[in-house]
Swiss-Prot record:
Keywords: Cell membrane, Cell projection, GTPase activation, Membrane, Nucleus, Phosphoprotein, Signal transduction inhibitor. Its main location: membrane. Residues 56-171 form the RGS domain. This is Regulator of G-protein signaling 8. The keyword Nucleus applies. One of its GO terms (cellular component) is perikaryon.
Length: 180
């Protein structure tokens, strides 16, 4: 009933929220979570590109819409912190200022790695402690071990489920229909 009272301009937000509130296999309106305007983004996304995401996890991560689709899928599984951590590490590696490097390193650690972090990633004790030690003298590689573990976890666990998900299969179907 509350959805009926919302202004029309919020329809996109309702669609996104509705999509994310369901299990990944029940979300068929993938366009709602694309980073650009859905119709324009879907027109730019070729069937070939979306199909290539199945070639490897790294191919998926190298594509803007692949990351957006995978993020939306992970949200339905309540595990988007893994991708967010991986992306934060990638951005961290681009840091050139030593002062910013230190503050960013501590921010990433506190948000994702520390025990009881708000978006704590699932890594083992040894990796967590090695990362903590690396923060004593932060460098561009201080998160490499933890990032590698999270990458491996997503690649072996979440990525195969994403490729089998209705969300991904619907996206492929939509992009193929657009070509017809």
């Amino acid at each position: 009933m509350a959805a009926l009272l919302m202004p029309r301009r919020n329809k996109g937000m309702r669609t996104r929220l509705g999509c994310l509130s369901h299990k990944s296999d029940s979300c068929s309106d993938f366009t709602a979570i694309l980073p650009d305007k859905p119709n324009r983004a879907l027109k730019r996304l070729s069937t070939e590109e979306a199909t290539r995401w199945a070639d490897s996890f790294d191919v998926l991560l190298s594509h803007k819409y692949g990351v957006a689709a995978f993020r939306a899928f992970l949200k339905t599984e309540f595990s988007e912190e893994n991708l967010e951590f991986w992306l934060a590490c990638e951005e961290f590696k681009k840091t050139r200022s030593t002062a910013k490097l230190v503050s960013k390193a501590h921010r990433i650690f506190e948000e994702f790695v520390d025990v009881q972090a708000p978006r704590e990633v699932n890594i083992d004790f040894q990796t967590r402690e090695a990362t903590r030690k690396n923060l004593q003298e932060p460098s561009l590689t201080c998160f490499d071990q933890a990032q590698g573990k999270v990458h491996s976890l997503m690649e072996k666990d979440s990525y195969p489920r994403f490729l089998r998900s209705k969300m991904y299969l619907d996206l492929l179907s939509q992009s193929q229909r657009r070509l017809s």
